[in-house]
Amino acid sequence: MVLKVYGPHFASPKRALVTLIEKGVAFETIPVDLMKGEHKQPAYLALQPFGTVPAVVDGDYKIFESRAVMRYVAEKYRSQGPDLLGKTVEDRGQVEQWLDVEATTYHPPLLNLTLHIMFASVMGFPSDEKLIKESEEKLAGVLDVYEAHLSKSKYLAGDFVSLADLAHLPFTDYLVGPIGKAYMIKDRKHVSAWWDDISSRPAWKETVAKYSFPA
């Protein structure tokens, strides 16, 4: 039975999709219409009790949360495609460290920018300019740390592309695109080089080409 990914067109599920494509794993996608509330229906809540995307079904096995799905796929299919977890326990420690940084430090201010610049009007709440300013300042500070780190390391976890890098792709793509703050990446030499590298990977290009919302 082919692995199924629910909600492919949204940003967080793309973490799972790019990992699956990198590893060469066959899968199918099932759309979830958040605007119609499909994510709050009993059938979907049976897969993801918190009502967010993605949810993944792999035979009889169910898993949700995009970074957990990334880890699951990279571990289960470790023998095929690029090793996204590292070759040593020390490598793995760095991958996990930067995955945590992405989830707890990088993502929160970027999510605020995403919601209040891209989706406030669609979701029916007023855009909070004060929060936008504070979030941009917070993200700038985080990116300054990335700049220093990436001046000494090609990728976040070392000299190899890992889940830590891939986890940044979906929302950073928003940052340099529809959010309109590409300068936050481009003005930092080493962050910019890293972004150009990871966003040029064929797996990410395929993810964007196949699973973005129609214009």
UniProtKB/Swiss-Prot annotation:
<dbReference type="GO" id="GO:0005777">
    <property type="term" value="C:peroxisome"/>
</dbReference>
<dbReference type="GO" id="GO:0046686">
    <property type="term" value="P:response to cadmium ion"/>
</dbReference>
<feature type="binding site">
    <location>
        <begin position="52"/>
        <end position="53"/>
    </location>
    <ligand>
        <name>glutathione</name>
    </ligand>
</feature>
<keyword id="KW-0346">Stress response</keyword>
<feature type="modified residue" description="Methionine sulfoxide">
    <location>
        <position position="35"/>
    </location>
</feature>
<dbReference type="InterPro" id="IPR040079">
    <property type="entry name" value="Glutathione_S-Trfase"/>
</dbReference>
<dbReference type="GO" id="GO:0009570">
    <property type="term" value="C:chloroplast stroma"/>
</dbReference>
<dbReference type="GO" id="GO:0000325">
    <property type="term" value="C:plant-type vacuole"/>
</dbReference>
<feature type="modified residue" description="Methionine sulfoxide">
    <location>
        <position position="184"/>
    </location>
</feature>
<feature type="modified residue" description="Phosphoserine">
    <location>
        <position position="12"/>
    </location>
</feature>
<keyword id="KW-0575">Peroxidase</keyword>
<keyword id="KW-0597">Phosphoprotein</keyword>
<keyword id="KW-0216">Detoxification</keyword>
<dbReference type="GO" id="GO:0009506">
    <property type="term" value="C:plasmodesma"/>
</dbReference>
<feature type="modified residue" description="Methionine sulfoxide">
    <location>
        <position position="123"/>
    </location>
</feature>
<dbReference type="GO" id="GO:0048046">
    <property type="term" value="C:apoplast"/>
</dbReference>
<feature type="binding site">
    <location>
        <begin position="39"/>
        <end position="40"/>
    </location>
    <ligand>
        <name>glutathione</name>
    </ligand>
</feature>
<comment type="function">
    <text>In vitro, possesses glutathione S-transferase activity toward 1-chloro-2,4-dinitrobenzene (CDNB) and benzyl isothiocyanate (BITC), and glutathione peroxidase activity toward cumene hydroperoxide and linoleic acid-13-hydroperoxide. May be involved in the conjugation of reduced glutathione to a wide number of exogenous and endogenous hydrophobic electrophiles and have a detoxification role against certain herbicides.</text>
</comment>
<comment type="similarity">
    <text>Belongs to the GST superfamily. Phi family.</text>
</comment>
<dbReference type="GO" id="GO:0043295">
    <property type="term" value="F:glutathione binding"/>
</dbReference>
<dbReference type="GO" id="GO:0004364">
    <property type="term" value="F:glutathione transferase activity"/>
</dbReference>
<feature type="binding site">
    <location>
        <begin position="65"/>
        <end position="66"/>
    </location>
    <ligand>
        <name>glutathione</name>
    </ligand>
</feature>
<keyword id="KW-0558">Oxidation</keyword>
<dbReference type="GO" id="GO:0009507">
    <property type="term" value="C:chloroplast"/>
</dbReference>
<protein>
    <recommendedName>
        <fullName>Glutathione S-transferase F9</fullName>
        <ecNumber>2.5.1.18</ecNumber>
    </recommendedName>
</protein>
<dbReference type="InterPro" id="IPR004045">
    <property type="entry name" value="Glutathione_S-Trfase_N"/>
</dbReference>
<keyword id="KW-0560">Oxidoreductase</keyword>
<dbReference type="InterPro" id="IPR010987">
    <property type="entry name" value="Glutathione-S-Trfase_C-like"/>
</dbReference>
<dbReference type="Pfam" id="PF00043">
    <property type="entry name" value="GST_C"/>
</dbReference>
<dbReference type="Pfam" id="PF02798">
    <property type="entry name" value="GST_N"/>
</dbReference>
<feature type="binding site">
    <location>
        <begin position="11"/>
        <end position="12"/>
    </location>
    <ligand>
        <name>glutathione</name>
    </ligand>
</feature>
<feature type="domain" description="GST N-terminal">
    <location>
        <begin position="2"/>
        <end position="81"/>
    </location>
</feature>
<dbReference type="GO" id="GO:0009407">
    <property type="term" value="P:toxin catabolic process"/>
</dbReference>
<dbReference type="GO" id="GO:0004602">
    <property type="term" value="F:glutathione peroxidase activity"/>
</dbReference>
<dbReference type="GO" id="GO:0005507">
    <property type="term" value="F:copper ion binding"/>
</dbReference>
<dbReference type="InterPro" id="IPR004046">
    <property type="entry name" value="GST_C"/>
</dbReference>
<dbReference type="InterPro" id="IPR036249">
    <property type="entry name" value="Thioredoxin-like_sf"/>
</dbReference>
<dbReference type="GO" id="GO:0005886">
    <property type="term" value="C:plasma membrane"/>
</dbReference>
<feature type="modified residue" description="Methionine sulfoxide">
    <location>
        <position position="118"/>
    </location>
</feature>
<keyword id="KW-0963">Cytoplasm</keyword>
<dbReference type="GO" id="GO:1901149">
    <property type="term" value="F:salicylic acid binding"/>
</dbReference>
<dbReference type="GO" id="GO:0006952">
    <property type="term" value="P:defense response"/>
</dbReference>
